[in-house]
């Protein structure tokens, strides 16, 4: 239908040329134009359905491919949202773990500081007690040594009661 309208339009445009006097050179172009139009019309008549079906198939193929790409794009966007959500959850979990680790480290530090303080105090008490015992032991040995020397020298005489009193006062 469109082809027929085009052919008629072309003929109407060429009609002024037909009314004029023609010489041989002008008729050749008209014949060639008419032959071309007939050739195009015949091609259109035989190939129009095949061309339409081919173009329709290509259109469907492109549409199908576009739908697949859009589905992939949608899946990619959903996957991106899911991964971003997982990333946020991982960040929150990491912050929670770091916070818990800091609290636990502080608790452990406090515990060991307290235990160390108690251990140091116990060591100081034990060392003072040991020093006191050693001082008493040394005093006792010194007093015994002095009394032993004094008894053996026999320059000074002590009664037993005097020795006991001296030992009680010094120890």
From Swiss-Prot:
Family designation: Belongs to the ATPase B chain family.
Function: F(1)F(0) ATP synthase produces ATP from ADP in the presence of a proton or sodium gradient. F-type ATPases consist of two structural domains, F(1) containing the extramembraneous catalytic core and F(0) containing the membrane proton channel, linked together by a central stalk and a peripheral stalk. During catalysis, ATP synthesis in the catalytic domain of F(1) is coupled via a rotary mechanism of the central stalk subunits to proton translocation. Component of the F(0) channel, it forms part of the peripheral stalk, linking F(1) to F(0).
Subcellular location: Cell inner membrane
Molecular function via GO: proton-transporting ATP synthase activity, rotational mechanism
Lipid biosynthesis as UniProt keyword: no
Designated gene of the protein: atpF
Listed name of the protein: ATP synthase subunit b
Coiled-coil region list: none
A GO cellular component entry from the record: proton-transporting ATP synthase complex
Pfam families (alphabetical): ATP-synt_B
TM helices/strands, residue ranges: 2-22
Organism: Helicobacter acinonychis (strain Sheeba)
Protein origin, superkingdom: Bacteria
Keyword Transport among record annotations: yes
């Amino acid at each position: 239908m469109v082809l027929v309208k085009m052919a008629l339009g072309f003929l109407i445009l060429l009609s002024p040329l037909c009314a004029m006097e023609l010489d041989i050179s002008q008729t050749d172009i008209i014949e060639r134009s008419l032959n071309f139009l007939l050739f195009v019309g015949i091609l259109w008549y035989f190939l129009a359905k095949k061309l339409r079906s081919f173009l329709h198939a290509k259109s469907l193929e492109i549409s199908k491919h576009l739908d697949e790409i859009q589905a992939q794009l949608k899946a990619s966007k959903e996957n991106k949202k899911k991964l971003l959500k997982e990333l946020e959850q991982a960040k929150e979990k990491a912050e929670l773990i770091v916070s818990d680790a800091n609290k636990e480290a502080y608790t452990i530090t406090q515990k060991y500081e307290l235990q160390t303080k108690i251990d140091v105090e116990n060591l100081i008490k034990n060392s003072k007690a040991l020093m006191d015992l050693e001082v008493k032991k040394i005093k006792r040995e010194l007093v015994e040594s002095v009394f032993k020397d004094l008894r053996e020298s026999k320059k000074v005489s002590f009664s037993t009661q005097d020795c006991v009193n001296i030992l009680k006062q010094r120890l």
